[in-house]
Amino acid sequence: MTTRWLILNWHAERQAGDGDAISRWTPYDKPVVSAQKELSKLPVYQRVYQSLKTRALGVLPADLNLRDQVGPTFDQVFTSADDNKLVVPQFLTRYGLQSYFVKQRDELVELTAMDSWVLNLTRSVKYSDADRAEIQRQLTEQYISDYTATWRAGMDNLNIRNFESIGQLTGALEQVISGDQPLQRALTVLRDNTQPGVFSEKLSAKEREEALAEPDYQLLTRLGHEFAPENSTLAVQKDKESTMQAVYQQLTELHRYLLAIQNAPVPGKSALKAVQLRLDQNSSDPIFATRQMAKTLPAPLNRWVGRLTDQAWHVVMVEAVHYMEVDWRDSVVKPFNEQLANNYPFNPRSAQDASLDAFERFFKPDGILDTFYQQNLKLFIDNDLSLEDGDNNVIIREDIIAQLETAQKIRDIFFSKQNGLGTSFAVETVSLSGNKRRSVLNLDGQLVDYSQGRNYTAHLVWPNNMREGNESKLTLIGTSGNAPRSISFSGPWAQFRLFGAGQLTGVQDGNFTVRFSVDGGAMTYRVHTDTEDNPFSGGLFSQFGLSDTLY
């Protein structure tokens, strides 16, 4: 006794006025009416198609999982943003098409009639032959659309994973070209489910004609047209290798290229040389050749091969940067930390001044930092190299680039190719408080002597190599005859310490005002510089620091 018969019998009993049947139905009356209204909003063919799809769950085997079809090396090569999209219902496979969908075609009309009856749309449904043909056409179109979209979503969700090292990528490439061949497996399962089979040559003309007319063959032929570009990659033609074979050959070249770097005595040095050759000399290499090939391939193979190429470039750059980091730490970061970082002006609270010799060696043009930049980092930064991992992160970190820009400002302010270390500036007297009659500003032996009267400007330099000893001092002499009072500093950075002891105001491009308060009096100067950045503000130095890592 079928469920459908029970439903029909219960309906007949209610129609005949059976009180027991009516009372048992009453609790379901409103929910059923509500469900009928909601379902009736959907097109009839969509309702019937969903019913057919639901029934398939009870008669077809378990869903097809692309992860299982690709095999045990899936995670070594692929990644998936949404594993649910890797699951294909058996209803939408070759097996489901041949063993279920095409065999339900005669029942589609009956399902449509039942749908109308269940929704109480009509008491008696009769369909003409034209109606039957239209029902079959609509449901077939829905099936083809669903089938195509599901397989496209599954293949689109198969992406090449990220690789952290050359060793990881070479291992994956070995699986791709000679191991489990996960790329070919993925394309093969797609082809097997979207392409009609090849007829035996033993078939007679009549048998072939009958086979061509079979519903499953016609549906698979339509699907074959939808996925023709993808399936063409596996097609073998006479006297011509398949697209997949050509891809394998190119990936083999890429694998050899990476393996040569990996097996070099110093892999990082070899990787750095490879990057320099490719960028500095526009050298063509297997990475370039593979990327060019990827552009000619159909999806999804173009995406997969392109991604393998991007990852190859990524791991080579990472290897090169890691190699550079060792030299960076030893040749750049170590001398900076040992000789400059903890001393004034880089540490404004330090009582110890940084050596001018150490400062010059480190920051001058072609000095320690500039030489490392020119020989190693410039190529990466000028070419704006990124990791190609979806986030478009640059290979050399942004904070490192920012510090290099700060170093260039220091170089521009304090160094010239003609004179080496040194900067020139002008000090203009502005005002002296009324309780003081004279001020004397001594900057490394360069005097700016001012008494109440007309203002003037003195041109000065730092450091003052014409005088031994480094003392900078401001002295104010009062009107009452008391002893002069001063603030003073000594050392190679004494000028900077003295300006730092004043109150900086009115800071603009090329000039700033500084006010000194001494013994109840005050003297104000305006300092003019040749550069937009104020060399005496201290910010350039105190904000400068170097990380041990570049990447």
Give each language-model segment a name.
Residues 1-551:
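C-terminal domain/tail detector
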